[in-house]
Amino acid sequence: STQGYSSAASDVYKRQVYMCYKSVTGPIEYDDQKTIRDNAIIARLIEIRKAQIEYKNMYKTHAGSFDDLEKFLNTDKLPFLIKEGVLTDEQLEKGMTEAEAVKKGLIRRDTMWVLAKDTLLGKNYDVAAMRYVPAVPGEKITFKMDTATLKSGSGYEIKVFACEVPYKEYLRDMDAQLTYNLIDKAEKQGKFPGLRVGSLEEINNNAGNWE
């Protein structure tokens, strides 16, 4: 019947409109979800970098594993300067130094030794979770982390580290074609297909590849 044909045609039209809508919203939804994950992962990589920098300050090399980094954060202590009072404009004009003001009891400067975790990341920070990639549902993903020694242009040996997670892991449950496109684009540009802080191939001052 004409009515049946009209209904079928309407269904086809609706499906076409829906597919067209999905082709637009699919990438938008993908980008939105990727941004949420990117932001959480970048925040975690910045925390790892902060811990690695202080680890190197203490041990002259980076932590080769998360076990070593966790032990450092949970057991080692870092100096924390307590400041009470500041030099007044009048004292500064008279050339008084902080050391002189401390000696005279006008201001206070004391050093306390505080757990590395508390100083760098806060008392409530979950150190045990540091090794895991955040914001990804399902089975936990562990960041890949490694260290190396590189030679600078002037011949100095420089200790470096890298910590990373590839797109294929942290976007594993999202649109496979869109993830493939991301990976393909990064590889064609000679870039790491994912998020990484530091590098084992070049001296980049612990930069993140999002910076």
What does each model-found stretch correspond to?
Residues 4, 18-40:
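Amphipathic alpha-helical segments typified by the pilin-like N-terminal helix
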Residues 57, 61-211:
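Low-complexity, acidic interaction segments enriched in glycine
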Residues 38-59:
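N-terminal alpha-helical signal peptides/signal-anchor transmembrane segments
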Residues 2-5, 9-13:
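Short, small-residue-biased leader/transition segments that mark boundaries at the very start
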